[in-house]
């Protein structure tokens, strides 16, 4: 199994009534801005371990690195009592704001977000521009444009999926053994080697009382949002970002693989033109989980950008 180079400290912080699980790698130089890493959908904070291990000794020793499990993922619950049956995207922004109050106070931070976490990071940087010094967006593309005419159908879909969830028909697969979880991760990402997949599986799942390995993500995350994605609102927020932004993409073009003709890289790049200072970087031989596929190269790029 993969052996981590830098051991994180796991702790729980009370955030908006939830016991938020946060991994930290403490640094020795309090004058440096904290580096905050936020993960994507159906992922966990530990997903950044390979990238953290790839940072140079000087960089990793100097900065405090902070990586939370979003609500309903990893070891962070989604509700004070039980599990939420649907999620509001704005809650991630508020959770992040409270987390920064706790860990950074009034100091600006450097923020890295992957996928859904990249979307949160971009929105947050426009809502609270003074709190972000620099931002790295790892394939946080946003979503395809919608039309108002889609609203009735979206509400119907949301309600129907809630009923499916409450009937127990919208679940996450459980696995007989940890090896099964590792194989699932390798099937999703063909570049992920067995040693890293096994390590990730142990942090991405846990055994239940019956001995089955369950994914550390709540089924409510599979329910569609009741709210349509608002491109014009997103662009207005992008225009409010003052921090330099590094937008990193993988050569596999996962955006086209997911959305086909609904949303393209060209459209995403056009949206990024609304950000005052934005640089785009593309990683070869990488897919959507580029922090797993190219951790050394990504760590080096981030260090140079944050310098």
Label each residue range with its predicted role.
Residues 138-173:
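A catalytic-pocket lid/entrance helix-loop region that shapes and gates access to the active site
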Residues 172-257:
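Alpha/beta-hydrolase
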Residues 15-18, 64-112, 153, 300:
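Active-site loop/oxyanion-hole signature of alpha/beta-hydrolase fold enzymes
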Residues 2-19:
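N-terminal cap/lid segment of alpha/beta-hydrolase-fold proteins
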Residues 240-286:
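Conserved loop-alpha-helix segment in the C-terminal half of the alpha/beta-hydrolase fold
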Residues 103-151:
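Conserved hydrolase catalytic core segment
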Residues 274-307:
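Catalytic active-site module of serine/aspartate enzymes centered on a nucleophile-bearing elbow/loop
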Residues 24-81:
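Conserved HGGG/HGGXW glycine-rich cap/lid loop of the alpha/beta-hydrolase fold
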């Amino acid at each position: 199994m993969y052996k981590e180079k830098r051991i994180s400290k796991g702790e729980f912080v009370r955030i908006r009534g939830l016991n938020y699980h946060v991994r930290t790698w403490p640094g020795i130089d309090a004058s440096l801005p904290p580096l905050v890493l936020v993960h994507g959908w159906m992922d966990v904070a530990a997903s950044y371990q390979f990238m953290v291990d790839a940072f140079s000794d000087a960089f990793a020793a100097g900065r405090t690195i902070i990586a939370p499990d979003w609500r309903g993922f990893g070891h962070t619950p989604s509700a004070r009592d039980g599990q939420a049956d649907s999620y509001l995207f704005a809650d991630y922004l508020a959770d992040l704001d409270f987390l920064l109050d706790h860990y950074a106070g009034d100091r600006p931070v450097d923020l890295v977000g992957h996928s859904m976490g990249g979307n949160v990071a971009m929105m947050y940087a426009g809502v609270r521009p003074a709190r972000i010094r620099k931002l790295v967006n790892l394939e946080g593309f946003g979503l395809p444009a919608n039309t108002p005419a889609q609203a009735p159908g979206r509400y119907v879909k949301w309600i129907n999926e809630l009923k499916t969830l409450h009937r127990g028909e919208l679940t996450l697969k459980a696995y007989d053994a940890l090896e099964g979880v590792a194989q699932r991760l390798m099937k999703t990402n063909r570049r992920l080697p067995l040693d890293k997949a096994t390590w990730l599986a142990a942090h991405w799942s846990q055994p239940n009382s019956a001995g089955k390995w369950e994914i550390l993500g709540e089924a409510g995350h599979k329910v569609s949002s009741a709210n349509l994605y608002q491109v014009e609102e997103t662009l207005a927020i992008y225009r409010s970002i003052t921090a330099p932004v590094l937008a990193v993409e993988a050569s596999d073009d996962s955006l086209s693989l997911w959305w086909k003709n609904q949303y393209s890289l060209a459209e995403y790049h056009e949206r990024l033109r609304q950000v005052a200072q934005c640089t785009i970087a593309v990683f070869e031989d990488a897919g959507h989980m580029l922090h797993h596929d190219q951790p050394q190269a990504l760590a080096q790029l981030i260090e140079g950008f944050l310098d």
